[in-house]
Amino acid sequence: MSKLSEIEALLFVAGEDGLKVRQIAEILSIPPTGVSQSLEKLTAKYEADADCSLALLETSNTYKLVTKQAFAELLRAYSKSPINQSLSRAALETLSIIAYKQPITRVEIDDIRGVNSSGALAKLLAFELVREDGKKEVLGRPNLYVTTEYFLDYMGINHLEELPVVTDTELVAEESQLFGQATESELE
C-alpha cells in the first residue's frame, strides 16, 4: 500500500470536511512536506486521467476529494432524481411494516398504521423499494407487497435476516410512541 493510496483513502473517508496537511501527517506518521508532495502527485494523477471523475480541492490548507466540474450536470440530474429525496415518515413507517411483515396487503398495513397508506405505498413502489408479489387468497384477492433487492441495497444489508430483531412488545411500544398512545403496561 503506497502513501498516495493511503492519503486518497483518508480523503475519501473524510468526505466534505476534508483534512489538513498536518492531520494527514499525524495519522500517517510522515512529515508534512511528504504529505504535500503526495497531494501534488495525487492532483496531477487526477488531472492526467480523463477517465477519472475525481479531483483534489484545496481550500485554506484543507484538502478534499470532489468530482470534476465536467460532471456537474450529471450530478445535478442525479440529485433531482426521486430516490435521492428523503422518504416521509409515513413512507418509512409503511416500509418498516412491509419489511417485517411481508408479504402483506395494503389493508393489513392500514390496520397496523391506523391510517390509509396508499400514498406512502405508491411512493415506495415508484422508488422500487417494494413490489407487488402476487395476490392474497381471500375475498377480493388484494395485492401482496414485499421488499425488493433495491431495498436491501438501500438499507445496506444482504438479507432480511440482518434487520434488527423487533419483538411484538417493542412494536407496540414504538407504535404508541409514534401515535402518542399509552400501552397497557404504561397504564399499570
Swiss-Prot record:
Covalent S-S links between cysteines: none
GO CC annotation: cytoplasm
Entry's localization field: Cytoplasm
Keywords: Cell cycle, Cell division, Chromosome partition, Cytoplasm
Keyword Mitochondrion: no
Gene Ontology biological process terms, A to Z: cell division; chromosome separation; DNA replication
Record note on quaternary structure: Homodimer. Homodimerization may be required to stabilize the binding of ScpA to the Smc head domains. Component of a cohesin-like complex composed of ScpA, ScpB and the Smc homodimer, in which ScpA and ScpB bind to the head domain of Smc. The presence of the three proteins is required for the association of the complex with DNA.
Family that this chain belongs to: Belongs to the ScpB family.
Protein role: Participates in chromosomal partition during cell division. May act via the formation of a condensin-like complex containing Smc and ScpA that pull DNA away from mid-cell into both cell halves.
PANTHER family reported in the protein's UniProt record: SEGREGATION AND CONDENSATION PROTEIN B
Protein name per Swiss-Prot or TrEMBL: Segregation and condensation protein B
